[in-house]
A protein has these predicted regions:
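Metal-dependent phosphoester/phosphodiester hydrolase catalytic core
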Residues: 2-575
Length: 575
């Protein structure tokens, strides 16, 4: 695409003072006729500056929506005709490109209710984040983008109900940990066919390792696109590689997503400005800035989350009528360094230091303020790492993960104390990170099995990380025996589907028999339910995956914390 420098300058000047036509504040301040008038100038602009020409289909990374409100949602795409171009620009020129967008009541776009235009530029990898406003609460909509003569795939999204509005039911799924090399994204194909209002992603969307550095017990089945990543072009290309999977694109296009990160979006086990591996703090902060920018460029996030160098505001709330409120946490960016080196360690003074925090003081205050004001039936903490206490060694000598909330007892005690003292209604924690399914009751005192149960934690397995899993083994059952507040374990891949009503919160553990080959069926391994006003989960259904006729038995292993940490440490040594 050849664009005259003068016209490019005039084009930018014309639209920078308006902001973007898609910005909700501007869209609300002008009439639909004014929008139609400005969009009517688009053919003239294209004749003046040239219709963009792409070397290949520019919407190769698909479309997505996220962070829904009662009157709007964020729409996302990125122009990338050559998504793995070495310079990280996706095959795009250095100039800006107009991208039109439409929102309609119907999939055929006969009833378009909102439309607008964004200017996509190289500073954000030609990504587009449209904050659409003026929509109706609790409604499905269809959306698409246009650039030049090219049209994107159609996405489907949904707004949330009006604040305080009565809601009979909500359905959402949560997922995490999708190491590309460890397996195929079959789970996302099944998820895209579910009837959901929302998807919550709890982190480890990408992995930073080079080719075959982190090897699954069942073997790696795909290859990363290059060595371990450090620079902005490398992080951009890693997201592009993961988005090359059609099942992941389908799940993004099917529902609005609410995303947060864990560690592998930057580097394994980092803590605030402290790298998880070697290197100086300055080097790590440069790397973190590149990683955060690439994350924003590839997620349906609002402009309030635009990174400022190595800092990015990710915590936020999503309220679903009077039924549920989601407090989306960031437990990486503000935490103290992991105690005792950050591995599996016995109790220690650093772990017990009440001043240490996994959320940071400001985010903890924000959480308490939100929980204290909430009038929702279900109060959900969407976060990354295992929240409940989990002694990982049988016998009298305890061992805990210092990277999880077990390494930050002060933070956990303050949250559980606040929930108990303030009588927060129906707290439920959803977590990822550990590549296995767990269910745990949250106790006022984990060392006293008879102490008050104050909440519930549902921990979801990985999409692929760890490779083919297995239902359970002796060591996993030993952990359950050592921790009487833990009710369930499963070591297979998949996601968790949740159904909320005013009376109950049900979590269905949806699992696959394998991810090392394509085409695995989905199965509900277990269903657990929390009743309104009665903290703690009860199993209400599910059974092990039955034998699959005609499918050879696939050798599988369970990757518990020790194996996972060892494999990732080996990956760090390899790199």
């Amino acid at each position: 695409m050849n664009i005259s420098g003068n016209w490019e300058k005039r084009r930018i000047e014309t639209f920078e003072h308006l902001g973007s036509i898609g910005r909700s504040a501007f869209a609300r301040s002008i009439s639909n006729k004014a929008v139609e008038f400005i969009l009517g100038l688009f053919p003239l602009l294209e004749r003046l500056v040239g219709v963009p020409r792409f070397s290949d289909y520019p919407f190769s990374l698909g479309v997505a929506s996220g962070d829904p409100l009662p009157d709007g949602v964020v729409l996302w795409t990125r122009l990338a005709p050559e998504p793995l171009a070495e310079d990280g620009r996706g095959g795009m020129p250095s100039g800006r490109v107009f991208v039109r967008w439409e929102v309609a009541d119907d999939e055929g776009f006969r009833r378009v209710v909102r439309r607008g235009m964004e200017s996509a530029g190289p500073e954000m990898a030609h990504s587009v984040h449209v904050e659409v406003g003026g929509l109706q609460p609790n409604r499905h909509y269809f959306y698409r983008f246009k650039a030049g003569s090219e049209i994107s795939p159609v996405g489907r999204t949904k707004t949330v109900p009006a604040p305080g509005g009565a809601v009979a039911q909500m359905r959402f799924a949560f997922a995490s940990c999708q190491m590309y090399e460890h397996g195929y994204y079959t789970a996302y194909g099944h998820m895209s066919e579910e009837d959901l209002d929302l998807v919550v992603h709890l982190g480890d969307y990408i992995y930073e390792y080079g080719i075959n550095e982190y090897i699954a017990s069942s073997g790696n089945v795909r290859r990363h696109d290059g060595p371990k990543i450090f620079t902005l072009p490398q992080y951009r290309n890693r997201y592009a590689l993961y988005r090359s999977a059609s099942n992941l694109r389908a799940a993004h296009a099917a529902f609005p997503w609410v995303v947060t990160w864990d560690d592998h979006e930057v580097e394994n086990n980092y803590a605030d400005g402290i790298p998880g591996g070697t290197g100086s703090v300055d080097e790590f902060l440069r790397r973190r800035a590149a990683a955060y920018q690439a994350y924003y460029e590839h997620m349906p996030l609002r402009r309030s989350s635009v990174p400022q160098g190595p800092d990015m505001l990710l915590r936020r709330r999503i309220t679903y009528g009077n039924l549920a409120e989601f407090n989306v946490l960031d437990t990486r960016q503000y935490r103290n360094d992991q105690a005792a080196g950050g591995g599996l360690d016995p109790p220690n003074p650093e772990q017990r230091d009440p001043s240490r925090t996994i959320t940071g003081k400001a985010q903890e205050r924000w959480l308490f303020e939100g929980l204290g004001r909430s009038r929702s039936r279900w109060n959900v903490l969407a976060q990354q790492v295992f929240f409940a206490q989990r002694d990982l060694r049988s016998g009298p000598n305890e061992v805990f993960s210092m990277d999880a909330w077990d390494g930050y007892l002060g933070s956990r005690n303050r949250i559980l104390g606040f929930i108990t003292e303030r009588g927060i209604r129906n707290p439920v924690v959803i977590s990822g990170d550990v590549h296995n399914n767990w269910v745990a009751n949250l106790k006022a005192d984990f060392d006293d099995p008879d102490s008050l149960t104050v909440g519930t934690e549902f921990v979801g397995t990985s999409i692929t990380s760890g490779g083919d899993g297995a239902d359970t083994n002796r060591r996993a059952q030993g952990i359950i025996a050592e921790n009487p507040h833990i009710q369930f374990f499963n070591g297979q891949r998949g996601y968790v589907r949740c159904v909320l009503t005013p009376e109950s919160f049900r979590a269905d553990y949806r699992v696959l028999p394998f991810v090392s080959r394509r085409g695995a069926p989905i199965h509900t391994r277990a269903s657990f339910e929390v009743s309104d006003g009665q903290p703690g989960a009860q199993q209400v259904g599910g059974e092990p995956i039955p034998a699959i006729p005609g499918v050879d038995r696939i050798p599988a292993a369970i990757e518990l914390d020790g194996e996972r940490i060892e494999a990732q440490q080996r990956a760090n040594r390899e790199s």
